[in-house]
């Protein structure tokens, strides 16, 4: 599988060989560790939607040295020398997870809710999770989508051509004709249009396939790339990515290319699903887990609750904290309505404490203020915070529901905390549904 380090969120990476056997840390050799630190420091701290401090933090521990902590983003970082660091989400499964195969399967299911590829592509990739690392799974999904396009037939278009022909067609290019054919008056240097597959979209795909051919360490992926390249024999490799991406045509005829063009940008231009764009030669393919978790839970809630007559909407932006100036929009993750009843659910990709311990289970004060604002502005007492279940909570087994209640003369706010089991999401949300309908 090549040179890689596979870690989970909240793992701590070090380069001190004396602690290489310590289970509290993930050990990385000095050269790769310094390249990783360089990558982190090259990312602008003022990135619009993603602060590097939410992803990787560099700390110093006495005796241990520099420590890199990982959180909130999942995916792949490829360092300049080809070494890969693959970050997987910390998902509680309740049992051993050899090679993180089940974690990868759950993560792919979650990722499918973002519609970056058709669901079938994620399902097929999931079958290979036990023998492919995360990067190879992403490559495999891209190849599946190319295969789907090839089966339907790659599109041709009228392409501008120039050539010195023995017959006349199109438009004579006078200057070039005089240069080339002063002693060959039987020939014509002309410009003409030809219906041909050598269009921008196909050139981009061919360039991506050739790049992935060099990068992949998977025998399965390498074989698939060879097969697919035969379908692009009449297509040139893109040599000017910017020009070809600008030349993409978006219409009904090219709908099958849309996802492939997005992912080709990821592989060719290092255009990420985050705003991270470091100045080093390192490349990254990263997904914000807060967004992935929110999208997945919202998708699954619609499946579970809609048949029971609930109207479920996500990221609803209809209320403001200050109505007169329409400022500070309130956007709860999920709003459910039925027969005049309103329930607000907000997802939080955070690891709560298993016990209260005087710290409110680790729930932030800012989150509670936010829930209180939702309650007042939406005129409902029913507020739910949805956290992923973790090992500490799982160990406690059956427990009293966690809730916080605030009452005054005219209204009541009840914030309920629920732990979602991502490995058994349907079963977990059915239990939540039963609690909502008690």
Please identify what each model-predicted range represents:
Residues 1-47, 277-438:
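Catalytic core segments in nucleotide and nucleic-acid processing enzymes
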Residues 2-277, 283:
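Residue(s) in the substrate-gating loop at a strand-loop-helix junction
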């Amino acid at each position: 599988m090549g040179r890689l380090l596979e870690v989970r969120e909240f793992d701590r990476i070090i380069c001190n060989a004396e602690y290489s056997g310590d289970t509290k840390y993930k050990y990385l050799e000095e050269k790769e560790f310094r390249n990783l630190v360089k990558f982190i420091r090259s990312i602008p701290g003022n990135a619009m939607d993603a602060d590097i401090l939410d992803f990787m933090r560099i700390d110093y521990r006495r005796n241990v040295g520099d420590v890199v902590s990982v959180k909130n983003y999942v995916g792949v970082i490829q360092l300049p020398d080809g070494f890969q660091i693959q970050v997987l989400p910390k998902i509680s499964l309740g049992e051993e997870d050899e090679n993180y195969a089940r974690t990868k399967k759950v993560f792919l299911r979650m990722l499918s809710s973002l519609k970056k590829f058709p669901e079938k592509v994620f399902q097929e990739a999931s079958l290979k999770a036990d023998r492919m690392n995360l990067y190879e799974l992403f490559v495999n999904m891209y190849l599946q989508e190319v295969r789907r396009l090839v089966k339907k037939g790659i599109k041709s278009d009228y392409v501008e051509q120039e050539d010195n022909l023995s017959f006349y067609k199109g438009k004579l290019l006078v200057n070039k004709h005089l240069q080339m054919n002063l002693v060959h008056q039987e020939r014509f240097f002309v410009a003409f249009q030809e219906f041909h597959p050598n269009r921008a979209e196909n050139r981009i795909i061919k360039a991506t396939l050739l790049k992935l051919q060099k990068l992949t360490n998977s025998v399965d992926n390498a074989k698939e790339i060879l097969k697919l390249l035969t379908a692009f024999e009449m297509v040139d490799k893109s040599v000017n990515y910017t020009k070809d991406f600008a030349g993409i045509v978006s219409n009904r005829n090219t709908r099958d290319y849309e996802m492939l063009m997005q992912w080709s940008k990821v592989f060719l231009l290092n255009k990420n699903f985050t705003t991270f764009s470091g100045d080093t030669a390192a490349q990254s393919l990263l997904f914000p887990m807060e967004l992935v978790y929110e999208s997945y839970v919202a998708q699954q809630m619609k499946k579970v609750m809609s048949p029971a007559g609930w109207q479920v909407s996500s990221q609803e932006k209809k209320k403001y904290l200050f109505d007169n100036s329409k400022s500070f929009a309130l956007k709860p993750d999920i709003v459910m309505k039925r027969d005049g009843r309103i329930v607000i659910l907000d997802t939080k990709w955070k690891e709560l404490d298993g016990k209260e311990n005087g710290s409110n289970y680790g729930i932030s004060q800012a989150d509670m203020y936010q829930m209180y604002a939702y309650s007042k502005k939406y005129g409902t007492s029913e507020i739910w915070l949805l956290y992923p279940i973790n090992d500490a909570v799982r160990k406690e087994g059956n427990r009293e529901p966690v809730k916080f209640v605030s009452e005054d003369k005219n209204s009541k706010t009840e914030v309920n905390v629920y732990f979602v089991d991502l490995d058994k999401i349907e079963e977990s949300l059915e239990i939540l549904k039963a609690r909502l309908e008690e």
